[in-house]
């Protein structure tokens, strides 16, 4: 059995390292420099010190990944549609399941990752792999828990058996939409928390902001589905991921917010983004979430405050006022 992982960023590479003890793995990258570097050093510059096993075969041509038993996609959400189209054009077989390990909302369509796949690859079943998991800790094989969300219970059981490792606790869910909403929004909330932390506004403000974040998840969740599953909200995919991402500077999104808050309105968003080794999904998701809230006619004040700071040049002082009030 072979699993193909599309995307050799920190997260995709960490998954490849984690799974390579149990089975053969193909790791696909569209970046020639990354391809050559990993093949030469058996290490990623995004996960220094974590060796990539020889059982991980790194490929540059996407046509070499389509014959795996399962495909995991770990590319940025804004690139997902293009990658799915490439898989379609390569003749991906309909019996190959796709596991999505990307978090966000497509800016141009306001669609979740599973909705994108359903449009481009309608014959392939989709599952979501999400939860509190820093890539570096996964690559070091430290313990963690995740949710595997899939509407087909039999397929879900099969995929869990493929992904199961000694250091991971996997929970099954049928709530594909809820899990994705949580996964996307928590990155925006982490940016907000980074700003609050940078200004040393205290644990009380930080805790209040994190708590209010769950209310915004619930608001979008209800608007999209008409129902908010309490098990999803209180499980690893929502509460667990939110707590981790909104409290640790190991979070790219929280670190991004912290740098902005420390800059006293003199920040250059693109420069801060370019300083990171990996994609800061919350930047794109802030815009998508704001536009989706407008479309659905719901209030999401934290997402709105982050959006207006990043895209409309609202001051940090006014942003903080909106966040704490």
Which residues does each predicted region cover?
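NAD(P)-dependent Rossmann-like dehydrogenase/reductase catalytic/cofactor-binding core
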Residues: 186, 193-197, 222-325
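NAD(P)+-binding Rossmann beta1-loop-alpha1 motif at the extreme N-terminus of oxidoreductases
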Residues: 1-60, 86
């Amino acid at each position: 059995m072979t699993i193909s992982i599309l995307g050799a960023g920190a997260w995709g590479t960490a998954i490849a390292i984690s799974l390579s003890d149990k089975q053969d793995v193909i790791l696909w990258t569209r970046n020639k420099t990354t391809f050559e570097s990993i093949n030469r050093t058996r290490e990623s510059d995004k996960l220094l010190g974590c060796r990539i096993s020889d059982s991980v075969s790194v490929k540059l041509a996407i046509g070499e990944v389509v014959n795996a038993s399962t495909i995991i996609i770990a590319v940025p959400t804004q690139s997902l549609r293009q990658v799915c189209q490439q898989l379609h054009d390569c003749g991906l077989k309909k019996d190959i399941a796709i596991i999505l390990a990307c978090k966000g909302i497509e800016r141009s369509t306001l669609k979740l990752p599973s909705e994108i796949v359903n449009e481009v690859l309608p014959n392939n079943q989709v599952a979501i792999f999400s939860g509190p998991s820093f890539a570096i800790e996964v690559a070091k094989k430290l313990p963690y828990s995740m949710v595997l969300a899939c509407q087909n219970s039999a397929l879900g059981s099969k995929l869990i058996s493929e992904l199961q490792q000694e250091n991971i606790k996997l929970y099954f869910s049928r709530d594909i939409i809820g899990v994705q909403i949580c996964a996307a929004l928590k990155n925006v909330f982490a940016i907000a928390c980074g700003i609050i932390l940078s200004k040393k506004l205290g644990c009380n403000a930080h805790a209040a902001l994190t708590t209010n974040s769950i209310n915004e998840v619930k608001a979008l969740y209800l608007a999209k589905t008409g129902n908010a599953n309490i098990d999803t909200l209180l499980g690893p995919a929502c509460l667990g991921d939110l707590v981790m991402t909104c409290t640790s500077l190991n979070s790219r999104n929280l670190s991004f917010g912290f740098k902005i808050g420390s800059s006293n309105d003199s920040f250059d968003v693109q420069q801060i983004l370019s300083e990171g080794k990996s994609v800061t999904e919350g930047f794109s998701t802030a815009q998508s979430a704001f536009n989706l809230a407008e479309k659905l006619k719901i209030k999401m004040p934290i997402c709105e405050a982050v959006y207006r700071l990043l895209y409309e040049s609202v001051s940090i002082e006014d942003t903080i006022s909106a966040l704490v009030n």
